[in-house]
Regions:
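Short strand-coil-strand connectors
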Residues: 17-19, 296, 311, 337-341, ...
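Insoluble glucan recognition modules
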Residues: 1, 76, 268, 276, ...
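Non-catalytic cap/lid and distal C-terminal segments of serine-dependent acyl enzymes
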Residues: 1-275, 286-290, 296, 354-373, ...
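Short flexible loop/turn segments that cap and initiate beta-strands
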Residues: 37-41, 295-320
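Acidic, low-complexity Ser/Thr/Gly/Pro-rich repeat segments typical of extracellular/periplasmic
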Residues: 194, 202-205, 284, 302-310, ...
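Bimodal feature
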Residues: 25-26, 48, 295, 299-305, ...
Length: 442
């Protein structure tokens, strides 16, 4: 057991020649760092550094120091140094987006991703290596980021596998998906694929209730990576986190998994569970199961291919990737076996499910809310007058949303009821929802 304490250091106003700005770096030094002065440590670099160890008015904390301390004290992970690289106000997307032709079709330039990459490799890393006792080389160097931080991690990892040997791409912003004024879903993929198989350990995930940050974007990229030569369960780990939202608290909740994958021992599988819709249509949207394996270390992953047994194959066939192929209405039980572990699930087949479900949302806001405010409740809700916002969208069947009503970017509702931490809904049938915002977080 480690009895010493880890320490935190802030390097304020760290300058960048490449980006012509300054920012803070937040450095976690592991428990033995100041006592064992001969020891050197692997390093994890993280984006959105202001949220890596603490919360602010724009978002919650990942509490990475807490997770790392716990895994080290349990003997599950080696001690590491963690470097949180803060964002610069109003420059986040600019710095996190590498330039490519697709990007210009979705966002307005400039895109400074290449310069941000150079800033990390040529300015931040030399400083960290000179200041702290680090292990050098890609086998000892990892990167982690979420959302837009996920896409910049993906790009840097594939562009510079000679520097970073492990990358955690969490809830990546690969596709700009939004509902237009008519409520129709528009999807614009804007990330660049590399089609290569570098010497890289890759963690890829997405939550099951992130709304338009859909599970399918992570799953589809994982399937492409397999075609590129990556091996699931070896140099590629996919996790589709059931019920998880697009938020710091959810990323914090699963950050232990990539830490174990990169720097520790994932342990042995102890259970498997089948997640996903229990209803599928002979006609309608394709449904796919999410088999989640849990390990004795707390590590988790989604099994990309398995051996399924269908009790009544006249009703349903099931592909190895968990895709349901309904044949005729009825109910049947499916079973997945992985070694000694078994999971089963009842599936009901109906004649038809709608591809899209109409969801109408009305939001009442406090009088202090500016009329010009942009309100989001899973998707953008238009102003309709007298402190009310109302809008409809045609949402893909089964898509789940978990969120707080927000005003613009980063300003969320303050929920007085301690039993209600976040709002949530799943588009299983036509619905009309009403939310009242009591107040906004300061």
């Amino acid at each position: 057991m480690v009895s010493m304490s880890s320490r935190m250091v802030e390097i304020a106003d760290f300058p960048s020649v490449h980006l012509s700005n300054t920012r803070s770096l937040y450095v976690y030094l592991p428990p033995s760092y100041h006592e064992n002065t001969e020891k050197h440590y692997a390093v994890l670099y993280m984006h959105d550094g202001q949220h890596v160890f603490a919360a602010d008015e724009r978002g919650g904390s990942w509490d990475m120091h807490v997770t790392a301390d716990r895994l080290v004290s349990e003997g599950r992970m080696e001690e590491i140094i963690i470097v949180g690289i803060a964002t610069v106000p109003h420059q986040r997307l600019n710095e996190y987006f590498h330039d490519n032709p697709r990007m210009h079709q979705v966002f307005d330039p400039p895109f400074a991703g290449e310069r941000y990459e150079s800033f990390i490799i040529e300015e931040v890393m030399p400083y960290i290596n000179q200041t702290y006792r680090t292990l050098r080389g890609p086998e000892h160097t990892a990167m982690m980021g979420s959302s837009a931080g996920g896409i910049v991690t993906y790009n840097i990892g594939f562009r510079r596998p000679d520097v970073f040997g492990s990358i955690a791409v969490m809830s990546p912003y690969f596709v700009k998906a939004h509902f237009d004024a008519q409520g129709e879903l528009k999807e614009h993929p804007f990330y660049e694929r590399y089609g290569t198989h570098p010497n890289l350990k890759l963690w890829l995930d997405m939550g099951g209730a992130e709304g338009v940050f859909m599970e399918k974007y992570a799953r589809e990229e994982a399937e492409r990576l397999v075609r590129d030569g990556f091996v699931p369960g070896d140099d590629l780990m996919l996790f589709l986190d059931p019920g998880a939202a697009h938020s710091q608290s959810d990323w914090a909740g699963r950050a232990q998994a990539p830490l174990l994958y990169f720097f520790g021992d994932i342990g042995e599988p102890v259970s498997i569970k089948l997640y996903g819709d229990g209803v599928a249509g002979v006609n309608g949207p394709v449904k796919q199961l999410n088999p989640v394996i849990t390990y004795d270390s707390g590590f988790v992953q989604t099994l990309m291919n398995g051996t399924y047994h269908v009790e009544d194959p006249e009703l349903l066939t099931l592909l190895p990737d968990g895709t349901l192929k309904p044949r005729t209405p009825g109910s049947t039980r499916i079973t997945l076996q992985m070694g000694s572990l078994i999971a089963d699930k009842e599936i009901t087949i109906v004649e038809e499910l709608p591809e899209l479900v109409k969801v109408t949302i009305q939001v009442k806001v406090p009088p202090s809310t500016p009329v010009s405010a942009t309100i989001y409740a899973g998707f953008e809700i238009p102003y309709c007058g007298e402190g009310l916002y109302r809008g409809s969208a045609m949402v893909p069947h089964g898509l789940s949303f978990t969120f707080k009503v927000s005003r613009g970017f980063g300003l969320h509702e303050k929920i007085g009821d301690p039993e209600v931490k976040r709002r949530s809904f799943t588009a299983s049938s036509e619905m009309e929802l009403f939310y009242e915002v009591e107040d906004w977080d300061a």
